[in-house]
Amino acid sequence: MGLSFTGKKRIRKSFGRIPETVAMPNLIEVQKSSYEHFLMKEVPAAERDDTGMQAVFKSVFPVKDFAERAVLDFVSYEFEPPKFDVEECQQRDMTFAAPLKVKMRLIVFDVDEETGARSVKDIKEQDVYMGDIPLMTDKGTFVVNGTERVIVSQMHRSPGVFFDHDRGKTHASGKYLFAARIIPYRGSWLDFEFDAKDVVHMRLDRRRKLPATTLLYALGLDKEEILSTFYDTVTYKASKKGWTVPYVKERWRGVKPARDLVDAKTGDIIAPAGKKISARAANKFADDGLAALLVSDEHLLGGYLADDMVNLETGEIFAEAGDEMSEEILETLKDTGVKELNLLDIDPATGVGPYIRATLAADKNDSREQALVDIYRVMRPGEPPTPETAEAMFQGLFFDSERYDLSAVGRVKMNMRLDLDAPDDMRTLRKEDILAVLKTLVGLRDGRGEIDDIDNLGNRRVRSVGELMENQYRIGLLRMERAIKERMSSVDIETVMPHDLVNAKPAAAAVREFFGSSQLSQFMDQTNPLSEVTHKRRLSALGPGGLTRERAGFEVRDVHPTHYGRICPIETPEGPNIGLINSLSTFARVNKYGFIESPYRKVENGKLTDQVDYLSAMQESRYSIAQANAHVTESGELDNEFVNCRVAGDVTLVPREDVEYIDVSPKQVVSVAAALIPFLENDDANRALMGSNMQRQAVPLVKAEAPLVGTGMESIVARDSGAAIAARRTGVIEQVDATRIVIRATEDLDAAKSGVDIYRLSKFQRSNQSTCINQRPIVRVGDQVHAGDIIADGPSTDLGELALGRNVVVAFMPWNGYNFEDSILISERIVRDDVFTSIHLEEFEIAARDTKLGPEEITRDIPNVGEEALRNLDEAGIVAVGAEVAAGDILVGKVTPKGESPMTPEEKLLRAIFGEKASDVRDTSLRMPSGATGTVVEVRVFNRHGVDKDERAISIEREEIERLGKDRDDELAILERNIYQRLGDLLLGKTAVSGPRGFAKGKVSQDALDETPRSGWWRIGLDDEKAMAEVEALQKQYDDSKARLDRRFEDKVDKLQRGDEMPPGVMKMVKVFVAVKRKLQPGDKMAGRHGNKGVISKINPIEDMPFLANGEAVDIVLNPLGVPSRMNVGQILETHLGWACRGLGKQLGEAYDAYKRDGSTATLRSELDRVYEGDELPETDSDIAELGLNLSNGVPIATPVFDGAREPDVAHWLTKAGFDPSGQSTLYDGQTGEPFRRKVTVGVKHLLKLHHLVDDKIHARSIGPYSLVTQQPLGGKAQFGGQRFGEMEVWALEAYGAAYTLQEMLTVKSDDVAGRTKVYEAIVRGDDTFEAGVPESFNVLVKEMRSLGLNVELKNG
């Protein structure tokens, strides 16, 4: 495979040994495919499957009125184009959504009064507007009210049946109490559970317990049927010596008989009591001709009857089925002369316990009617039951598809667990299902089978955005259904149309509520491209229908063997959410049932094949799967005779021939963020967790720099996140500037398609986290690019690779205590050269409303404000773009009418004569908050439709229209140039049969075309029909494109001039964007990729920094004590390898300088061959020269996780770069010039600046807001609060005996209201005396004591 456009500019040398046979799936596919399946927007209405939105409509409609005289049915739905595009929605605080039109059919029937027969009277069809449905952007996000949001996928327990026990915790004896639970997708939960007395109970929706047999009665079984379902019968025949029973060898294997076994034929004892009968002995008895055993009357006592016992003479039932055999019953039997007796085959010794029989005995009900009434009383306590209501309620519980839905997943799971064969579309429960569940539960109690592991990923599934939305929309439609039914009954059904019946508000409200306030609809983490990707791949066990933090135990949060290749064992938050919020592994995908699948490569007879299968956790348990690092020969065969494999969750050695699958890649175990950590295998898991989490907090820097030591994942993340722009088609770069790239396509050309692709770049946009989104082109005019090549870098990307931080020279050594406890000492060079400088954009907005006292006004005329404060405002009262603003500066001037006391008639007259007073308004301007500074970079003014625009709004609008016009003209020029070039190529050399006036017929030449105006080329007729068809297609495409451009321009201008939709009462809104350049400073947090984090303690002059023998000063000094106890040795290996990369880069830089001197690339090529050791290199000299220049700062390498560089590789590269293989160097003290006594580890490391900036945290207050009750200052920067002086601080002052300082702290500096006012007055007077009074909190205490009935009075003196 050839090198890509960016790949040949900077080749990353990989240390990976294991070839990857499967391409990694698109990282945000989970989101996009799920929502596409829900909307089915591109699928024609007739071809839509019964899933997603189609399924929701089908499940709710048709809706019948109560009299069944009319039916409203759903036909199809379609989406109209969205009103605003994504960018416009973000600017106007709107939701990016498409109007949903649903075709409804209303059928009205004629009902014959006498016969009740119905005939169709009228059918009306109509499109009904059903609200707006939010659309997903190309990046897998939603724009809701102007902000980008992500719907996080939810992990929940799969529908189906689960068996478990209480682990001996319920009963004091420690006895296991088994339970079964049938969980539907929608509907009532059904639980079965054993109690300590071995009676089986059932619960509906976790309500009061009932005997399980009550449910069986309600299902229509009687007592004998229940017993015959759960137990076999043993027939005893009367004989002279006692009773004979057939000998069944299977029943006696491994059993200790309680009594002697006697042969019925001979009377011999064949097995004594208490001695275990082996399987072999049991078989031998049968082989020796043992057919029946002889038992005495005592043996029958304690047995249970299988049938009702009837006295044949009187017809009286003297013993019922299930009754325990007693001496009286036995006597009665003998008296009636019974020759044959059926007993239930219940014998705990043979593994059949009397649980169902005991439940029957404990059940007070003995008929279906009684059971139904009992269930009704539990479900609807307080309501009087009737047989009809009880029956209807019971049917609705499990057997009505509208109220109960197992879902296809639930049915599949149930069939597998219970070994049933019900069809997938059987979504309700059946009698057979309930009986099978009870049989399995009883089997578990008898010691047969295993309980389920609820944390196994075969029992947990993922609900992605499409499914979550489907559930929410169903709720909205069900609310709407009730309203439709009521309206159908209350209107004249003959005259109404479908839209009169449908009120779409409940459906629209459900959608709005879901996207706006659901726990799973989250404000997107947009700090950098990695944080976006990770957020979209997140799996949460929280949210509606999920777990809660408080209830989740250790088991749910723990790593499970089935997580392998599906959920990352490393990336999860620290704190209360640990283990509840996870991330999908790199290669994982979600199947149609919602189970996570991981890819494996098929192995046949020890040989690897190219077949790749995706397996879910359930399927995987059946196979033996080798790890990706298993030794494989060059011919693709497993090398070792025995291979380490995972089989059903355990790791064992398996013979080579028995291996069925092998992992596709070592990194399929971990998530995207963890796969970006080089030498992950050398880091402790806790630190790797911090490393993967902190990469998501890295701030995009002004100059991005890809890591020298990477893992090969960087380009994949940059591409899939959408931060970098990739070419859609192969072509040549026609035009490039900062805001757009134009590519002339050279492949995939079609006369009906445009020949040029135009890519617009985002410039200095604000992200959700106030970081800066800026894209810049990396191509030049004339460059040839292929489809998929990166043509523009985005935030935190460098030549199409993720670049979260910078590569800096670090030394591990203590430095005068400035790197104590993870502090970081940095060189002044880092600040001077803007190495870690970032741009942050803050948005401030203000709205002018129409109040009861009059409209607010945005103006420059503000009362009691000097001209100095207004220096940055224009005539309209809005700050100018480019103004430097600091805390307290006015951004937008605004005045609000004051409320005043009623005026006397005289005052009204004076007011009418002399006009308004200035004092009638108060200043409510938008000011910069405390601690904030920056430069105004953009101002947007929004006016309500119909409100007059001020000069600033008009000038912004004029500029915007000019920009749109220029855009349209530029695009039209590009389009025309391309179209006429293609038209010219098409006409040249062909034979013209007609043309414009003066055009010579015959062969078309270039000169003839040059002499003819281009607009006349269309009139040239050719004798070649195929060519003419192409000309016509080209003309149609040109006309269509021109019309589309004009239409888009007019549409955008119309939107600009029309005015904006505003919230109620808002007349005008102004948004001001302020950019601030944040340099690195003490207090900022930095981190590496291995969980090594610290805070900058000091910025040291370059001359004081430790330096190398060649005079180069190190950039950063880190504490060596941060490594051994944290066990993240990966950072040391990265440092060494980074040092080697930089050394090799310098060597290549020297070779490049030689090329610049003598013009020959021979030296450069040989150096590159030495570094890349046979890897593919560019062919042309210009490409080689550019590669040499790009690599002069360091050779980038990839060390994939679990398959990266080993220690010998690192030493080899250090030697190759000309360094000591120990990786240590002699450093000199910058302050004295003396060498340090011992060698120091120096190297290059990729460090990140995290989004915990001291500027956002530091805060100071003199006076500010106070709490209403206690009158103490509020806390926190957001509330402009004070510094808390707590209990322990009070102890400190007490210990020092600083009585006056303490008194001041507790009174005038806190909540002594009168005292603090006096202090303020004293300061104004220039005085420094004050007197402390009573703190307000003491008054609160007194009031609280009085409220408790304790009167507290203060006495003076």
From Swiss-Prot:
GO terms for biological process: DNA-templated transcription. Gene3D superfamilies: 2.40.50.100, 2.40.50.150, 3.90.1100.10, 6.10.140.1670, DNA-directed RNA polymerase, beta subunit, external 1 domain (2.30.150.10), DNA-directed RNA polymerase, subunit 2, domain 6 (2.40.270.10), RNA polymerase alpha subunit dimerisation domain (3.90.1800.10), RNA polymerase Rpb2, domain 2 (3.90.1110.10). It comes from the Bacteria. The keyword Nucleotidyltransferase applies. One of its GO terms (molecular function) is DNA binding. Keywords: DNA-directed RNA polymerase, Nucleotidyltransferase, Transcription, Transferase. InterPro entries: DNA-dir_RNA_pol_bsu_ext_1_sf (IPR042107), DNA-dir_RNA_pol_bsu_external_1 (IPR019462), DNA-dir_RNA_pol_su2 (IPR015712), DNA-dir_RNAP_su2_dom (IPR007120), DNA-dir_RNAP_su2_hyb_sf (IPR037033), RNA_pol_bsu_bac (IPR010243), RNA_pol_bsu_CS (IPR007121), RNA_pol_bsu_protrusion (IPR007644). GO terms for cellular component: DNA-directed RNA polymerase complex. It catalyses: RNA(n) + a ribonucleoside 5'-triphosphate = RNA(n+1) + diphosphate. Its EC number is 2.7.7.6. PANTHER family: DNA-DIRECTED RNA POLYMERASE I SUBUNIT 2. DNA-dependent RNA polymerase catalyzes the transcription of DNA into RNA using the four ribonucleoside triphosphates as substrates. The RNAP catalytic core consists of 2 alpha, 1 beta, 1 beta' and 1 omega subunit. When a sigma factor is associated with the core the holoenzyme is formed, which can initiate transcription. Belongs to the RNA polymerase beta chain family. This is DNA-directed RNA polymerase subunit beta. It comes from Maricaulis maris (strain MCS10) (Caulobacter maris).
